[in-house]
Amino acid sequence: MDSSEVVKVKQASIPAPGSILSQPNTEQSPAIVLPFQFEATTFGTAETAAQVSLQTADPITKLTAPYRHAQIVECKAILTPTDLAVSNPLTVYLAWVPANSPATPTQILRVYGGQSFVLGGAISAAKTIEVPLNLDSVNRMLKDSVTYTDTPKLLAYSRAPTNPSKIPTASIQISGRIRLSKPMLIAN
């Protein structure tokens, strides 16, 4: 088995892109597109119920701090098992939703497109799973002159393992690229 194999899984979603303020018909500020990646949560030591809003996630707010506008260009959730997952498999539930969705991590399978993944065990132990964010189902604008309530949010859940590990057996990272524009005047 190739340990570098990546399984890419699309989430079914309803096309409902967010609306944003119209751009003025004048010269625009230059923009820069930067990559980002951060660990959203870990699994395997206890029950995990995570809700990660990209608009308020600490790594994203630090990256976007010196800019007035920030827009997601691409984004994905990456489920990564560790070597401990071979002997301690676990099921992880995952769904991308708009931030204003009332769904909770324990309701993922009742959300259209919510999925479950088995991490670990003899068959899928070394496979990384990528779940891309469908940008047509959320508002891409994380930072603007107004605050949007339908920006991307990741829901993730895993029950408490039968034999909890002292260190995590899997983790989930959120990775992507973000367009930043209109620098702010800030004190150094």
Curated annotation (Swiss-Prot):
Domain of life: Viruses
Keywords: Capsid protein, T=3 icosahedral capsid protein, Virion
Cellular localization per UniProt: Virion
Molecular function per GO: structural molecule activity
Matches recorded under SUPFAM superfamilies: Positive stranded ssRNA viruses (SSF88633)
Main location: virion
Coiled-coil regions, chain positions: none
Keyword Transcription: no
A cellular component annotation (GO) from this entry: T=3 icosahedral viral capsid
Function: Self-assembles to form a T=3 icosahedral capsid composed of 180 copies of the capsid protein. The capsid encapsulates the single-stranded RNA genome.
Family to which the UniProt record says this protein belongs: Belongs to the tymoviruses capsid protein family.
Protein name (record): Capsid protein
